Amino acid sequence: MTVHMKKPLAVVAHDASAAAHPGSARSTTNAATAPTTTPRNPSAVAGNRNRTGIPAHAGANRGNGADGHGAIASTATVANKTGKTMMTVSQLAMLTVVAVASLRSLPAMADYGLASILLYLIPAVVFLVPTALVAAELATGWKGGVYVWVREAFGNRIGFLAIWLQWIQNVVWYPIQIAFIAVSLSYVFGMGGLGNNGVYVAAVIIVLYWASTMVALRGGNLFAKVGSISGLIGTLFPALLLIVFGIIWLAIGKPVQTSLHASALLPPWTGIASIVLIVSNVLAYAGMEVNAVHANDLEHPGRQFPRAIALATALILLVLVLPTLAIAFAVPHRELGLIDGINLAFREFFDHFGMGWGTPVISLLIALGAFASVVAWIAGPSRGLLAAARTGLMPPALQKRNAHDVQEGILIPQGIIVTVLALLFVLIPNGNTAFATLVDMATALYLVMYMLMF
């Protein structure tokens, strides 16, 4: 792209943002094959903030909205002047919430009662908030996600390592998350034991993952709608329902299954095991950076992305802390399972209040929320991997994009890998243990990515 320095700064910055966006028509030509009639901008190769070498926030962050008054839509998808459909603050925030917050972990934390508050807040202060702030700062200055951020500091190869670590961690995580969906769906049909059937779990993983891939292949606007709507009804609504149940439980004087003394606010200290517990909760907040690749899908990234991150941070803490306490108040610790613990917790509440019909309904909503998290994670890391692939670090076949400008050259092989991993539930009797080991290994690799990011 030729840069005419006589343009107003805001126009140049806008052009830079469009050029850096993977979905932009201007980005379809690799810098290495740019037309010789147009001088190549050295910043596109040297690793400046964007292809013009001008900070992306120099003009774009100060621009007004389409109405000339800086109005920002926050509840509906909008279109910019070029007719391109844009994300909104609420959509991106919801995608981030469903990518990070998982209802599956609530029962395990409920076992610690009031101490779970501190066990959530410490990792939030030392990891979640710093990660959110770093992601907001980097995303509004350097477009492209983790790959671009690390590349700016350490070069292309280390940048590729960072995005690969993020991507491979997710490839292993997809079957685990969809297995949780399979268990929730078994409660929908009143067959909770079906979740132990390897063939059933593998079939659900394969079908739902490829369905998620088809959604992602249709383009950013569709997956944003699916992710935000499913996240609302499948993550926020069940979390709020647990909070309501917990309040009612206390208000009517039902027996509380955990200690409410002030001393219970401090988790028991058992040496190194307590440190491991806090670290594991740190990893529960991983993913705040994954949707930074969609910053360019906002009308005004410099203003809207930090707002989306701030909103997502507040919602994540809401989804995790208060529902965990509600479960701790009402559900005996011995009944808290791991994979199906959240379903058992809701069944305890519904059966107690004579609403047994609610268990399959809420299990379906939880499955939708988990499905939304899969959709949210499919698009982010693979899109960042595409940015690395286009520098020549991956074969041309993996750089292929479809008519919707989505990275099908990466998503299709990714789906094949997930399909093979899903078959392990059938082939290996202790498939859950094998997958847990793989996830632990992938998470350790993910920590290296965060070290590079910070």
Language model segments and positions:
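Membrane-interface "cap" regions at the ends of multi-pass membrane proteins
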Residues: M1-H21, R26-T33, T37-A136, T140, ...
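Helix-loop-helix connectors at the membrane interface of multi-pass transporters/channels
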Residues: P8, G68-S74, V78-T82, V148-E152, ...
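Hydrophobic alpha-helical transmembrane segments
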Residues: A93, L118-I122, F160, A202-V207, ...
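Hydrophobic alpha-helical transmembrane segments in multi-pass membrane proteins
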Residues: L95, Y120, A124, N170, ...
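Hydrophobic transmembrane alpha-helices that form the core helical bundles
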Residues: A110-D111, V129-Y209, T213-L217, L222, ...
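Structural signal for membrane-spanning alpha-helices in multi-pass inner-membrane proteins
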Residues: A132, Y187, S212-A216, L242-G246, ...
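TM-loop-TM module centered on a large, flexible mid-protein loop between adjacent transmembrane helices
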Residues: Y147-V150, G155, Y187-G192, A308-V375, ...
